[in-house]
Amino acid sequence: MARLFSLKPLVLALGFCFGTHCAADTVAAEEADGRVAEGGAQGASESAQASDLTLGSTCLFCSNESGSPERTEAAVQGSGEASVPEDYTRIVADRMEGQSKVKVRAEGSVIIERDGAVLNTDWADYDQSGDTVTVGDRFALQQDGTLIRGETLTYNLDQQTGEAHNVRMETEQGGRRLQSVSRTAEMLGEGRYKLTETQFNTCSAGDAGWYVKAASVEADRGKGIGVAKHAAFVFGGVPLFYTPWADFPLDGNRKSGLLVPSVSAGSDGVSLSVPYYFNLAPNFDATFAPGIIGERGATFDGQIRYLRPDYSGQTDLTWLPHDKKSGRNNRYQAKWQHRHDISDTLQAGVDFNQVSDSGYYRDFYGGEEIAGNVNLNRRVWLDYGGRAAGGSLNAGLSVQKYQTLANQSGYKDEPYAIMPRLSADWHKNAGRAQIGVSAQFTRFSHDGRQDGSRLVVYPGIKWDFSNSWGYVRPKLGLHATYYSLDSFGGKASRSVGRVLPVVNIDGGTTFERNTRLFGGGVVQTIEPRLFYNYIPAKSQNDLPNFDSSESSFGYGQLFRENLYYGNDRINAANSLSTAVQSRILDGATGEERFRAGIGQKFYFKDDAVMLDGSVGKNPRSRSDWVAFASGGIGGRFTLDSSIHYNQNDKRAEHYAVGAGYRPAPGKVLNARYKYGRNEKIYLQADGSYFYDKLSQLDLSAQWPLTRNLSAVVRYNYGFEAKKPIEMLAGAEYKSSCGCWGAGVYAQRYVTGENTYKNAVFFSLQLKDLSSVGRNPAGRMDVAVPGYIPAHSLSAGRNKRP
């Protein structure tokens, strides 16, 4: 919920104690001291006059070079004398008269001090019979970082009630600033008060670029609740939102109430959502957001969050009763994430995702969300981590079944469900050796394929011979797999197995030298590495393929013993990987700045196990070259590149190169090109994948155009498709004082082979209060690597380039 403001009750500031030390015979002795402070008190009182009861200028684009609020402490003048004893009050003035225990009047540069609070005023009357103090024509009160100024104040010290007129307040606590003006301020006793005709914001002094205007505000500090009636949000002098009633917390704690609406526009028309927040308990809250999407209809969003020392979670639900655009009913998206720490060694969790139909992401999300949500995860798990048999044991039990969404042609490639999986990994150190065993039992289920169970047991032993200059790590293992397959398609049930030995040796060394680079001292390393791997070739075409897939060939694959993901396929290997990498480390901190590497694999046998399980022949004696380079150059430039080069055909199979320039926060230039000669593009209607060249250029930038205005752009172009994949352009503005920031963004992106979607959204950030519209940060982080929202940049940092 938006945190509007928090006021201190005046009873603490004006709790005067007129004792015998304020008697008439003492007043005369203090007159001389009062004249010393006359100049300061007079100036403060004059500044307190509220001749124009406004927060300041409503100009949105006025310059403020300082960008910082004035200090409230300078507006009140103290007496300069020793501190006042607790519960005693000091009055310093040009003139004082009256009778002790009846009435006292102080005039001329009046300074009243009590318990750290200081009050400046033109005159003050204290009626001891009614225990009431009246001050005017102007007053200024300073206490605990809060400055309250006004014209007149009448206050009953005993009942803690009173009224002030034309009141202006400024406060700063915990780095958060608040200023307000009110026609009247009624003190209702015991921390309760009422403000009428009030305006407030969190901007610098005199800045009213935005504010909240209310007919009245009632606050109860004991309950920590404030209630505003007939409140409007005003931006640039123009009211944007109105509510007849709103409540809010005074102490910064969460409070049930309306949140700021969200507004956007796009291919589906204008969208509006009005959320309401329920603070159900300190560890339990909920949000309900009814809304409307212009061309689709009413929507209802809900979220529940809970947090306990031993468990936490979140549930999200979006429901569209009737989609006018598609004609579908009851479209929805549901999510539930839960984690439970049952004990120090036992954890459990749930990850559940589901949508109503396969077109949900295409209709309501962008291209990246569409590509990343083909198989929606639905998983329940239980994990154990502890000690057993003198070693470390990690075990788990899980059940997993995906919701697979069909492509636009109606075809979907659904993975097997895991019903269930039980896994365990145990290892124990014995000197330089480590012995261990991994085991996994999985029951696979599928509506249209053969079901079965798989047991994998993989015992092994490895040694670690390492020192300061390098390492040698040999390993011996035995990979055993057993299947129990159900009858399917007229075939009887059967059992089958596979046992393969695994031998590999990983070794490397490190050479270092101190040098100078990028204007400072660095350490450069040269790290050659060898990896020998042996696994005999064995036909596996009689084994099912429940979860194995090919991995793309890159630098990391040089050191994998199995190039297939999953346990159904194990490659044949009699090869030696040779590689060398170099790193640049900061000479003072050891932080890595840059690394690059290149490597190749040499084959001693030509056997190869294919994905279908058959054993084929690899006519090559060595693999393609793979290389990479990534890191920072000179503190401003970044590089991230990789290549897979086919030396036989003398062509690149795949490469990507990206460069970035980031001279300062808020200044980002990115360029990235990606090429793949034979990439998996999309799933066709017949169930096969379409492979083609992938050639894409991605340009993005965030750059200041003026001191306050920045541009954000992204252009992602597909050369093979001969069309843009995504285009984005936006402008962000931050006020000079940082009181508010705003952005407007337009986006066009691909949702299918021949379909696009357009979107326009805006955001308005209000300092220390809330945001209006959609928060662009998450989307921009992906679109523009290195992006920082303009309102998050320090004032004055966004200089003209």
From Swiss-Prot:
GO terms for cellular component: cell outer membrane; transporter complex. It is found in: Cell outer membrane. Keywords: Cell outer membrane, Membrane, Signal. Pfam families: LptD (PF04453). InterPro entries: LipoPS_assembly_LptD, LptD, LptD_C. One of its GO terms (biological process) is lipopolysaccharide transport. Residues 1-23 form the signal peptide. PANTHER family: LPS-ASSEMBLY PROTEIN (PTHR30189), LPS-ASSEMBLY PROTEIN LPTD (PTHR30189:SF1). Belongs to the LptD family. Component of the lipopolysaccharide transport and assembly complex. Interacts with LptE and LptA. Together with LptE, is involved in the assembly of lipopolysaccharide (LPS) at the surface of the outer membrane. This is LPS-assembly protein LptD. It comes from Neisseria gonorrhoeae (strain ATCC 700825 / FA 1090). The gene is lptD.
